[in-house]
Amino acid sequence: MGRELQKKKNRSGNAKIKLKPKSKRVNPLGNAIIAANWRQEETLTQNYRRLGLTSRLNTVTGGIEKKKAGPESKTSTANKLAISNTIPKSLAPTEARVERDPETGKIIRVIHDEKKTNPLNDPLDSEAEDGEGEGFEGFGDEEGSASKNEIVKMLEEQASRAGEKRERQQSEREKEWIERLVKRWGENYGAMVRDRRLNPMQQTESDIKRRVQKWKDAGGSVTTEA
């Protein structure tokens, strides 16, 4: 019988409703600095490019928005380290010295320029790595300026500030539970552990001792009935 009902449901014309998971929705306005400089008329990629940020670290695989003709953004740091997968269509000619055998005239070897070739335009295989005493000084812009975007500076300063760590406070129910334990067993923490009625969650001796000490430091004491 159950199988027939299942077949009937599968043949039904009523479409199954699937809810979109809210956990996958990204809130780009969670940061106050980004929210203050956000433009609603622009897309997420356009806003990130203008703010000097990037939404992904991998190289672009397709579906890139075509930019208008003109100078590129000087504050964007997106895809600066992405390695291009395309091979240049035209290679510039280079000069080299040829050594020949003085007797036969055959080419013995070809000596190229000391400049290291980089046909794939790999930024990790550039001349800057061969120089001595040179370090990474940031992305900069096309004009060679090392000045960073002000928004990026504000975000870096915000990230460098360590957040204040708040100590966990004991709830009223936890205080009442500790008070009942201390009222019954005093300082006998071993008996507190073995008490199945007052310790149903089987807290360890060290855990109960730490909670009791914290409760006493906060001014907790056993109340006596008159």
From Swiss-Prot:
Compartments where found: Nucleus, Nucleolus
Region (Disordered): 1-23, 62-177, 196-226
Record key words, sorted: Nucleus, Ribonucleoprotein, Ribosome biogenesis, rRNA processing
Residue ranges, compositional bias (Acidic residues): 124-144
Polar residues: compositionally biased ranges: 73-88
Function: Involved in the biogenesis of the 60S ribosomal subunit.
Family indicated by similarity: Belongs to the NOP16 family.
UniProt name for this protein: Nucleolar protein 16
